């Protein structure tokens, strides 16, 4: 797996869509004939408008995201080809990340470097915990609880660090980049601003659901280890 694929895969896996976020996006997924273009067309227009060098737009099946390594805004087909409010908001949000990248946002650069490392740490920590009974049988020396707990915590703590770094990046992309762009450029009507704001908030809060999922997983592992 290439470094780029690792980053993209880890980013997508780290951002499950929460129930409220999914509802907000689906609620405004109906076509808006008055829209001047689709999500994909808006993304291309904004990239040209803000002179984002070498940034391209393409369709993906891995979830909407911006790839800072390959400089690509990737949108789901349903957002790339759609004139819905959700498509427009999501496209602007992802271009917001491209703008952050061009501006040299240190938080985005830090997250990009952290993701592949955290992904490996998380995977290895879970694998070691899962294989601990087998390791104990082979070595004839059960792994101490403290070591198992430390290994388990390392992966979850690493993922929590990613969430802590990511949340402000997402809110900046939504409310310091996408919303002002859509409002000031008259890409959405004033009557639709509230709906767009809800969609952008949902996009940013997907990381909160990811953090909560990790906390639940951590609690599950602690319970399992305490029973050993």
Give residue spans per PLM region:
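Juxtamembrane "helix exit" motif at the C-terminal ends of alpha-helical transmembrane segments
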Residues: 1-3, 125-142, 214-228
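Low-acidity, Ser/Thr- and Arg-rich intrinsically disordered low-complexity segments
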Residues: 2-18
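Hydrophobic faces of alpha-helical transmembrane segments in multi-pass integral membrane proteins
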Residues: 4, 17, 88, 92, ...
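Generic alpha-helix initiation/capping and coil-helix boundary signal
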Residues: 7-8, 36, 145, 166
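Polar-ligand-bearing catalytic/cofactor-coordination segments
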Residues: 21-121, 161-228
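Hydrophobic transmembrane alpha-helical segments that form the core helix bundle
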Residues: 117-176
